[in-house]
Amino acid sequence: MIQFILNNQIIKTSVKTGVTLLDFIRNHKQLKGTKIGCREGDCGACTVLVGTPNNNSITYKSITSCISPLGNANGKHIVTIEGINLPNNLLNVTQKAMVSNYATQCGFCTPGFVVSMTGFALNNDKTTTCNDAISGNICRCTGYKSIEKAGIEITHKLQHKNDNAPLKWLIKEGFLPDYFESIPQRLKALLNNSGNASTSASLNSTKVANGTDVYVRYADQMAQENICLLANNPTLKGISFTENTCSLRANTTVTEILENKQLEGFFPKLKQFLKLVSSEQIRNMGTIGGNFVNASPIGDMSIFFLALNANLTIQNKNGVTRKISFYNFHKDYKVFDLEHDEILKEISFKTPKVYDFFNFEKVSKRTHLDIASVNSAGSISVKNNCITEAHFSMGGVAAIPKYLHKTNAYLIGKQLSNETVKEAEKILQLEISPISDVRGTATYKRLLARQLFFAHFLELFPNQIDLNKLTA
């Protein structure tokens, strides 16, 4: 039994957990405002908000419901476009802004934009812009400037939001209907009576976190299966720190990493790096464990954590754990060191010191919302101009996310200089084996590999490394 609140209605259903949330909303509940578009999580027409209990409040995030399993709604508040309408058919502030700025054309994309903007209004992160919030929404009529103007109008109104009681303020000012205020207590009561949907199948079944990859390819198959849902498993969530180590449970999302202040302290450009990873909705869904197990040769988070020399904790159905180095996890294309009754539980890495430097680079056909042609990350320790540790990784240049063993080994013990970087790049070219595909020819990818490798050093050591000398 899956139990959650859909807009203002308590839902108790025995529909299969693998059915998409979008199909349940439209076909079982006849709420047609949430649109069917790409069914790949790219266009945002199916955007809904997911409210997750957080102490005595609810944290809302936008997701694409077309690739989200229904079972993940268990114990949550799901909000569609119908759920943010005000009584007596009055328009809320976001809807008024869209109308007054002529931001609707054919109207197909409009519900998704309005829901994403409502998520922005509910978000208390001052560094997030309205454009960030709608980054995963596509307007096929290309009415973006009018939509951006609506976003600017909403942003100006939100400058007066009461940070001490944000939900009350949003209701009072007409952003949300007043039933939102009752959701925390209603969800709490529901959770006391509901089980964990993650227990609906054994670990020998198909395991799904938030579905951002597997539902793109196998949504129809997943709808028929009794899948093992991991997203609501509390033992797989959370970020923790010890004196020298950061540990992230496998269901930690990209957004949770991006918003973590301690991680940002270690990686000042963390937001800049991770804004290159997918869209707002997918970052809210995509987990690091899922990215690793997806085993894509160009998985952004795999490349990121390979460069941190991360370790993985793997657990079987009996609770027995084992640890391996992340660079030993991927064996071949889509082949990795995980048995059928095992799950990836935790990722850990040593936190950087003052002499450690980190950088992430990505080249794709579009700067944002695209799969990389080649991506790369590098972590390097330098003491007295001597490289004491090096961990560089690269995606799109091999059958697996590539940890550059030979390149890293060469760098250790060398002086940081243009000549060292040039020689290391020659070794890199011998390590990689790119192929020609839709994202570029093998020759092009080798050029990108060189440029991104150089870019790490130019970004981290601009006073010591000279591009002209590297390319001379």
Language model regions located:
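Eukaryote-biased recognition of intrinsically disordered, low-complexity regulatory segments
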Residues: 1-9
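Short cysteine clusters
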Residues: 38, 43-46, 66, 106-109, ...
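A basic, amphipathic helix-loop patch mediating RNA/tRNA/ribosome contacts
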Residues: 17-48
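NAD(P)H dinucleotide-binding glycine-rich loop of Rossmann-like/cofactor-binding domains
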Residues: 75, 79-101
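Residue-level signal for mature regions of secreted extracellular proteins and peptides
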Residues: 31, 36-39, 59, 99-102, ...
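C-terminal structural segment of proteins
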Residues: 10, 49-50, 62, 93-99, ...
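S4-like RNA-binding module at protein N-termini
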Residues: 50-80
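Short, contiguous acidic and Ser/Thr-rich linear segments
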Residues: 10-18
